[in-house]
Amino acid sequence: MNKIISKKQFSEKVFCIEVEAPLIARSCRAGNFIIVRVDKNSERVPYTIAKADPEKGTLTMVIQEVGRSSTKLCDLKVGDEVADIVGPLGTPSHIENYGTVVCAGGGIGIAAILPILTALKKAGNRVISVLAGRTKELVIMVDDVKEYSDEVIIMTDDGSYLSLIHISEPT
């Protein structure tokens, strides 16, 4: 069983859930994913690992409620447990120092690019991140992205968020 450590609601149907999974947290890499089963009667559903914290032994997922399984997971509270988590699965992304890279994501897709842009920055790249969403509220994890980006561009369909954030001056 894997206990839910924290839960944050980004919008009406989008949640950020952090769960205990120490073995997976220590061995996952950018591009890996997990399969979660909420209870013994639930289906197995794949989710992107948005963040892994090897020291805390936790994984963070961003889930959008769209069906029975995702709703069941999003209905859980801090302290509740999921039946099992399998992973890390998939082939990790190839990461090296390319020089300058651009990472783009929109809506909950921002969670999918976060581990990749983090790994690219740690490999010595200059990272430019482009984030988008229908509204300002749907542009998620901005602070997490800023932490590993040299420049962040944020846009929305409705114009409620249009900015260029220079994290550090280019060298």
Predicted regions and their residues:
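Helix-rich terminal scaffold detector
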Residues: I128, M141, V145-E147
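Residue-level detector of conserved catalytic or cofactor/ligand-binding positions
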Residues: I165-T171
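Short internal beta-strands
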Residues: V127-R134, I154-T156
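Short, surface-exposed secondary-structure boundary micro-motifs
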Residues: D39, G87-P88
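Generic structural signal for buried aliphatic residues
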Residues: I34, V82-I85
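Extended interfacial segments that mediate partner engagement and assembly in macromolecular machines
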Residues: V82, N97-V102, A111
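Ferredoxin-reductase
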Residues: M1-V78
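Histidine-anchored nucleotide/phosphate-binding helix
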Residues: A112-K121
